[in-house]
Amino acid sequence: LAYRDDTRALKQAVANARGADVLVLGTSRSMQLRGAFFASDSFYNAGGGIAYISQAQVFLENMPPDARPKHLLLVLDQYFYNETWTSIEPEDSAALRPYTQPDAFYALRRALADYLDGKYSLLHVLGTQDGVYGMSAAGRGAGFYADGSYTYGTAVLHPEKSVDAEFKDTFQRIAKNTNRFEYGETPD
């Protein structure tokens, strides 16, 4: 996932295979909900499994009937209620795309470029502890837990290095009327 964003397909595949009793479904905003927060041992966080509200129904319909949850926590983002945002949804956004293997050459090029930019150290990555898998987890301590929840790793410890440090990116998106901050007259 580090060099392509196939989170939606991954979350669908894991949710289908696990058939958890408690399922969290939403955008990345829901990824911080962890299994330890719930009384059930049968939990999966499918945060990132949807970007538009219409995708939630498709996600659930694409689960085998015996894998569907007993309890669903559907996390709704504020922009789901903005008619301007929902009007730009691609017509095929709800279509389920299969999980595909990454293009190794593309991933290698991106990894090399990130290494040359100093985004990670080979010694640090190669010296990671057992149970840490992937470049993002090794380099930044960020990634998915087994229950589907997510940790932002060093981004939490050093928010000043974030793309959105001091809400700079958020304020730019609001000013530009774009990327989930489209202006709207009335809630949808």
Predicted regions and their residues:
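N-terminal secretory targeting modules
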Residues: 1-19, 67
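Short, flexible loop segments at the rims of nucleotide/cofactor-binding pockets, characterized by
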Residues: 2-4, 48-51, 185-186
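Non-catalytic accessory regions outside enzyme or core folds
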Residues: 6-9, 36-38, 154
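Membrane-embedded segments
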Residues: 19-114
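Secreted/periplasmic serine-hydrolase-like ester/acetyl group-modifying domain
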Residues: 89-188
